Amino acid sequence: EADKSIYDKINSKLTLIDNVKVYDRNKNVYIESNNLIYDQVENTIYSHGKTLIKIDDIYEINSKDMLYDRNSMRLSSKQDTIIEDNKLNIYNFEQGFLFDTIKEIISSKKTNITDSSNNNYSFENTKINLKTNEIVGKELRIDFIDSFFGNEKNDPKLSGKSAYTDDDKTKVFKTVFSTCNMINKSCRGWELQSEEFTHDKTKKLFEYKNSWLKVFNKKL
């Protein structure tokens, strides 16, 4: 569906212009854009400008200049992209992304995630397995909601050089963690540094290996 269509017989390409709406029934993929090009030879769809894609009523993707390969069922873009799922998680991908919709794996250079509890996670060189809820990445930073550890006056943050997380546990390496209030934003009261940090989500336990505590501007 579109206001205007142009078919190039020589190159076997169909261009759809303005108010474009495409529903791929075989793949259960819905696309909205103002300019789409369907390449029959390559079996690909390329969008120019803002694009909305919905997959299986599970994922909603907002991006620009997207490539949809119908053979491999891969979506990609070099532009900033936001993906929302039906579990209220929001994935913000900077500098583009690649989404293998069959394996449900997303790769991105820079990733920001806001989970359903409103905690914020930042990664670099990330791979996300949406089937298993596994995330692997580098340069992790987590901004927890202030009340995450039971005190709304806290400002809990955690950072690490690399990380792995799934439904059962989160493991972060070379970690810096603090729950101290940062009213003046100039310096934390304390921070805990660890070679390895593990959060057992089932047992609700935190484990630290090779750790040391730093206290700032305090007399002990």
What do the PLM-derived regions correspond to, one by one?
Residues 1-220:
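Structural signature for solvent-exposed beta-strand/loop edge elements and short helix-capping sites
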